[in-house]
């Protein structure tokens, strides 16, 4: 996967992400996950694609799934194994998922992974590979950033140093700083709006079952900035096309 620029493949970023929890803006990305999985998923075999340091993998296990986490970053996988020695964390080279069981998973979760993957063709290739890993009744939950996250301020993020984000077009790079940890080096993501994702899903042989854009309710113990008015995340619930 020669055009995959992974800005998270370094020890400093892995160490920073290992300290993240489900607080502040990140709370909204996972708050509704138990309900979504209860509604749509039958079975317990799960894959966490782009697991990073294992935060989302451990959540799935807490929710009762038998889960394997995979990532292309050796630093992230090393950190996940250090935090959770009993967990199943696997390093995959680029987008080679041939070692994973075909039609072996009732659930595949991908949290924020596709924010950093450029180009429709690369996204489609990955989604097709993930589709082949799903059981016929399996579900793929893809959580990604909304375009609005890159032009507003948040409890967990800042974009005020990057006014060029305002003029970004679909497929352009955008920058964002995570304020929940000390490493303030910006992440370089790819702007990919809703219509572009719908096209990618269709070409990948995936059907959209549900779309959620979670907002903060205002009664949570977090210092919301934009979260009660603007959704930072969009959660796509997908299944193989019939």
Name each region found by the language model.
Residues 110-113:
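A short beta-strand submotif of the Rossmann-like class I SAM-dependent methyltransferase core
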Residues 99-108:
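A short acidic, Gly/Pro-enriched loop at the edge of an enzyme's catalytic core
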Residues 1-41, 55, 59:
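Conserved class I S-adenosyl-L-methionine
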Residues 47-49, 53-97:
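Class I SAM-dependent methyltransferase SAM/SAH-binding core
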Residues 141-202:
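SAM-dependent methyltransferase
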Residues 124-136:
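A short glycine-rich, Lys/Arg-flanked "PGG" loop and its adjoining helix->strand segment in the class I
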Residues 204-242:
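C-terminal lobe and adjacent flexible extensions of AdoMet/dcAdoMet transferase-like proteins
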Residues 115-119:
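A short His-aromatic
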């Amino acid at each position: 996967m020669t055009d995959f620029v992974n800005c998270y493949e370094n020890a400093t970023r892995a160490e920073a992400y290992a300290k993240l929890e489900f607080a502040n803006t990140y709370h909204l990305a996972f708050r509704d996950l138990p309900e979504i999985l209860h509604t749509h998923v039958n079975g317990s075999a799960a894959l966490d694609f782009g697991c990073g340091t294992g935060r989302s993998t451990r959540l799935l296990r807490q929710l009762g799934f038998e889960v394997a986490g995979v990532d292309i970053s050796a630093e992230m996988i090393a950190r996940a194994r250090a935090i959770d020695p009993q967990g199943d964390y696997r390093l995959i080279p680029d987008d080679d998922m041939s070692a994973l069981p075909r039609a072996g998973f009732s659930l595949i979760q991908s949290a924020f992974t596709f924010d950093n993957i450029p180009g429709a063709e690369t996204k489609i290739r990955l989604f097709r590979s993930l589709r082949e890993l799903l059981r016929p009744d399996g579900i793929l939950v893809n959580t990604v950033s909304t375009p609005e996250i890159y032009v507003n301020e948040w409890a967990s993020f800042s974009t005020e140093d990057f006014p060029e984000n305002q003029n970004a077009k679909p497929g352009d790079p955008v920058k964002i700083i995570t304020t929940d940890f000390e490493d303030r080096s910006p992440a370089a993501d790819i702007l990919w709006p809703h219509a572009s994702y719908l096209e990618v899903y269709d070409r990948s042989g995936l059907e959209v079952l549900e779309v959620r854009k979670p907002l903060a309710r205002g009664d949570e113990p977090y210092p919301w900035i934009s979260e009660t008015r603007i959704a930072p995340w969009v959660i796509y619930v997908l299944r193989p096309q019939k």
